[in-house]
């Protein structure tokens, strides 16, 4: 009896969501276009990462090699962005990675993904609000910081911020009110802030290359106590002395550690994927918006971080407001005010971009019954999830008040990297699943999306699917290595499911040995070399097995290229970056997940909307997406 109950609960945790994307009904307002999405992605991304985080990472982790850290972080984000683009074309609904996981790998994984997305967006909001406060404080002579240090010090080192930030709380509450007014109004404000931001960043890059010096990329240890033009009162970093000088003062390990933190700077693009029910043409606008915003952001991060470290020795950079300080260092006093004002606009856009997707993920989870139902309430006049917006703003305000910027950023990176990994795995699984031949497939589309050529091609694809049924197969070595069918079957789909799970285990093993067993590898320890080589070889073999399986021919407006290599590479990069984060970050992450599991097993599991569906309802093996293709 007990086993039967456990089996039933296990089946409930793995149930998948039924989605009918051929229906356009939504309680939200469809009013956004492609330019709105690019502005939203760029605005939400080019904020604290470029104006604040660049200084902290250059000083503490990477030095001038921060440009390489941003390059590695951009690679991880582009790989994930392509996977998001395919799912945005396949399932244009509100929920982003949460929904993608729900229709593919089941409810428990979907909850984990959604819960981590909420964490990421809350922390993104909190960290940008703290950055806004620090930049504004620098502009007016730091009276806010002095007041906090004098009257509001918290004595909980390693747990809470030394100085609470009441001004960051006020900023969050103001923008929460703006978001409740409506999507169109928020998008207009965001575009204004983003345009100013891009102009300011262009000015910073040009100024940095004009006033900067390559000598700041070639510093030696002798220069640490003798900097030209400015006395650094404290050259020491949190880890001790500021490296060994040169372009890569903390070594390549410092570059990788910096990349794990810099990854935070590219997080904003996934807010585009949460707008599926508020975009006029989601199948084309979402992929284009994601790719374009990531390209623009990488150019900006690379250029600004290079300019920053050329203008000023990396160990003299201010952790909270490096750009105004750098312009002061090179003697451009007036420019520091222009940059500070521009950075406030950028941080405002970034704050809006961080706050925008948060209530939409909460709304999607609440509507599915995994979070409390009252959070799914939508205001009749503004067509926004008003309760979710207010609740998420309140939680973000508390986080901004209590926690430090660096701690917030690292914790955010874990949740986001996990979500990105699951989306990549979902793309891999879904592209090799069998179709259901007794249904006519219809790409999710708005009325004006498909031109006649696309419609003819889609009809031709559907006709070919209806006229060719995969032959019945038996599970064997021949089936694994050389399948007979040209179309996916249940057996080939199962092979890909098992292979994807195995690859995840192998990648985790490889990354753990590489990061935690670095010293053993350096000494040539046999066990470490065996695990590293064995996991890499097996991963290559299993990737080959997936490559041999027949791929779905269903037409989408955007597909991830180079399957199965690209999603697997995305998973590897994400897991490797996760392993670069410190132990304290993992402990805080575990506490957040514990709270989430209490909510899911105490409420979500028993109130899920999928539980109310007929257990005998026909579902396709690919996650119930027949009408989404």
Curated annotation (Swiss-Prot):
Protein's cellular compartments: Cell membrane
Residue ranges that the Swiss-Prot or TrEMBL entry lists as coiled coil: none
Keywords: Amino-acid transport, Cell membrane, Glycoprotein, Membrane, Receptor, Transmembrane, Transmembrane helix, Transport
Organism whose genome encodes this protein: Homo sapiens
Function: High-affinity, low capacity permease involved in the transport of the cationic amino acids (arginine, lysine and ornithine) in non-hepatic tissues.
Cytoplasmic side: 1-35, 83-102, 184-191, 268-287, 359-384, 430-492, 552-559, 606-629
Effect of pH on activity: Optimum pH is 5.5-8.5.
Membrane topology, record value: Multi-pass membrane protein
Family the UniProt entry places it in: Belongs to the amino acid-polyamine-organocation (APC) superfamily. Cationic amino acid transporter (CAT) (TC 2.A.3.3) family.
Tissues and organs where the protein is expressed, per its UniProt entry: Ubiquitous.
Protein's recorded name: High affinity cationic amino acid transporter 1
Matches recorded under PANTHER family: HIGH AFFINITY CATIONIC AMINO ACID TRANSPORTER 1, INNER MEMBRANE TRANSPORTER YGJI-RELATED
Catalytic reaction(s) noted: L-arginine(in) = L-arginine(out); L-lysine(in) = L-lysine(out); L-ornithine(in) = L-ornithine(out); L-homoarginine(in) = L-homoarginine(out)
Subunit structure, as described in the record: Interacts with TM4SF5; the interaction is negatively regulated by arginine. Forms tissue-specific complexes with ASL, ASS1 and nitric oxide synthase NOS1 or NOS3; the complex regulates cell-autonomous L-arginine synthesis and citrulline recycling while channeling extracellular L-arginine to nitric oxide synthesis pathway.
A Gene Ontology cellular-component term: basolateral plasma membrane
Segments traversing the membrane: 36-57, 62-82, 103-123, 163-183, 192-212, 247-267, 288-307, 338-358, 385-405, 409-429, 493-513, 527-551, 560-580, 585-605
UniProt GO MF annotations: amino acid transmembrane transporter activity; basic amino acid transmembrane transporter activity; L-arginine transmembrane transporter activity; L-histidine transmembrane transporter activity; L-lysine transmembrane transporter activity; L-ornithine transmembrane transporter activity; virus receptor activity
Keyword Methyltransferase: no
GO terms under biological process: amino acid import across plasma membrane; amino acid transport; L-amino acid transport; L-arginine import across plasma membrane; L-arginine transmembrane transport; L-histidine import across plasma membrane; L-ornithine transmembrane transport; lysine transport
Glycosylation site positions: 226, 235
Membrane topology, Extracellular segments: 58-61, 124-162, 213-246, 308-337, 406-408, 514-526, 581-584
């Amino acid at each position: 009896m007990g086993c039967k109950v456990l089996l039933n609960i296990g089946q409930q945790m793995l149930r998948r969501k039924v989605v009918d994307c051929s229906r356009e009904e939504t309680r939200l307002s469809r009013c956004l276009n492609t330019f709105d999405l690019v502005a939203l992605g760029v605005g939400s991304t080019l904020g604290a990462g470029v104006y604040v985080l660049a200084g902290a990472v250059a000083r503490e982790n990477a030095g001038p090699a921060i440009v390489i850290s941003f390059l590695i972080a951009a690679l991880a984000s582009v790989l994930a962005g392509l996977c998001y683009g395919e799912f945005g074309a396949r399932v244009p609904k509100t929920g982003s990675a949460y929904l993608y996981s729900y229709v593919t790998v089941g409810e428990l994984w979907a909850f984990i993904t959604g819960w981590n997305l909420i964490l990421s967006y809350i922390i993104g909001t909190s960290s940008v609000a703290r950055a806004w406060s620090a930049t504004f404080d620098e502009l007016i002579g730091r009276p806010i910081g002095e007041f906090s240090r004098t009257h509001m010090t918290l004595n909980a080192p390693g747990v809470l911020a030394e100085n609470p930030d009441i001004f960051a709380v006020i900023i969050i509450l103001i923008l929460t009110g703006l978001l409740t007014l409506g999507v169109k109004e928020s998008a207009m404000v965001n575009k204004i802030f983003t345009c100013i931001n891009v102009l300011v960043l262009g000015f910073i890059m040009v100024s940095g290359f004009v006033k900067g010096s390559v000598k700041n990329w070639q510093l030696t240890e002798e220069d640490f106590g003798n900097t030209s033009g400015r006395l650094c009162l404290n050259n020491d970093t949190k880890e001790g002395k500021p490296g060994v000088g040169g372009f890569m003062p903390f070594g390549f390990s410092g570059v990788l550690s910096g990349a794990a933190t810099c990854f935070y700077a590219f997080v904003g693009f996934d807010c585009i994927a949460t707008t599926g029910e508020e975009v006029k043409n989601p199948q084309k606008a979402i992929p284009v918006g994601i790719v374009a915003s990531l390209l623009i952001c990488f150019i900006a991060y690379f250029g600004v971080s290079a300019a920053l470290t050329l203008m000023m020795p990396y160990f003299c950079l201010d952790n909270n407001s490096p750009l105004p300080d750098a312009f002061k260092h090179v003697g451009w006093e007036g420019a520091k005010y222009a940059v500070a004002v521009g950075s406030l606009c950028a941080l405002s856009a970034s704050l809006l971009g961080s706050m925008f997707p948060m209530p939409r993920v909460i709304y999607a989870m609440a509507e599915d019954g995994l979070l409390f139902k009252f959070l799914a309430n939508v205001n009749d006049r503004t067509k926004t999830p008003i309760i979710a917006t207010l609740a998420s703003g309140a939680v973000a305000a508390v986080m901004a008040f209590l926690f430090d910027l660096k701690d917030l950023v690292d914790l955010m990176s874990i949740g986001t990297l996990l979500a990105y990994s699951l989306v990549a795995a979902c793309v891999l699984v879904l592209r090799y699943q069998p179709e259901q031949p007794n249904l006519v497939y219809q790409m999710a589309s708005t009325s004006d999306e498909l031109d006649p050529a696309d419609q003819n091609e889609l009809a031709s694809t559907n006709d070919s699917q209806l006229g060719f049924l995969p032959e019945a197969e038996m599970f064997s070595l021949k089936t694994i290595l050389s399948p007979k069918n040209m179309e996916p079957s249940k057996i080939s789909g199962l092979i890909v499911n098992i292979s994807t799970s195995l690859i995840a285990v192998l990648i985790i093993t490889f990354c753990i040995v590489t990061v935690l067993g670095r010293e053993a590898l350096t000494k040539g320890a046999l066990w470490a070399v065996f695990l590293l080589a064995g996991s890499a070889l097996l991963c290559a073999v299993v990737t080959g097995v997936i490559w041999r399986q027949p791929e779905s021919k269903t037409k989408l407006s955007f597909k991830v290229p180079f399957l199965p290599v690209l999603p697997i590479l995305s998973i590897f990069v994400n897991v490797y970056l996760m392993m670069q984060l410190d132990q304290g970050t993992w402990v805080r992450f575990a506490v957040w997940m514990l709270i989430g599991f209490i909510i899911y097993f105490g409420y979500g599991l028993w109130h899920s909307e999928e539980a109310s569906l007929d257990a005998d309802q026909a579902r396709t093996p690919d996650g119930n997406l027949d009408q989404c293709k």
